[in-house]
Amino acid sequence: IGRLVGSEMCIRDRIEIEPGEEIKIGPFDIECIPITHSTPETCALSITTSRSRILHTADWKIDADPVVGAAWSAKRFRELGDKGIDAVICDSTNALRAGYTPSEGEVAAGLRQVIQRCEGRVVVGCFSSNVARMQILASIAQLTGRYLGVMGRSAAGMARCAQQVGLLPDSFQPIHPEHLGY
């Protein structure tokens, strides 16, 4: 929406849906189901008409131990499956690979172990939308006596927004990147 507003495109009839909310739009009953992903507040949509049910997941990650947001609800997806789904539209990185992706909680433990053994400056890259990873790195920086800097316009903007809406704690205080060399 920010890009649309920034480009001065008119946004008419916008409907905001909260995670867990159900709404009706014309012939469509839509349930907004919270799912885990590196982007906070990601939701799947269960779209039902009198003739069919479609599940649209967007990108997702099954994570029973997320750092930010609610855990994946296997129960809710089992209930949807029991009701019957006519089509699933989904996208998930590495979904066709065998095995599983570690939870963000497991990633945090691994990062902490690696960074604690390092001397001096540590540089970690991640997607700018990965608010949980920013929170993990801030905690590790504090634990190891380091400072955290968030570099890049997208990452800095995401960190600011996440803090404003309460996804990052007030204690999340990155220093300006130009001060990281001191």
Question: Would you name each region that the model predicts?
Answer:
Residues 54-58, 85-96, 115-120:
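Gly-rich Lys/Arg/Thr-decorated short loops/hinges at beta-loop-alpha junctions or inter-strand turns
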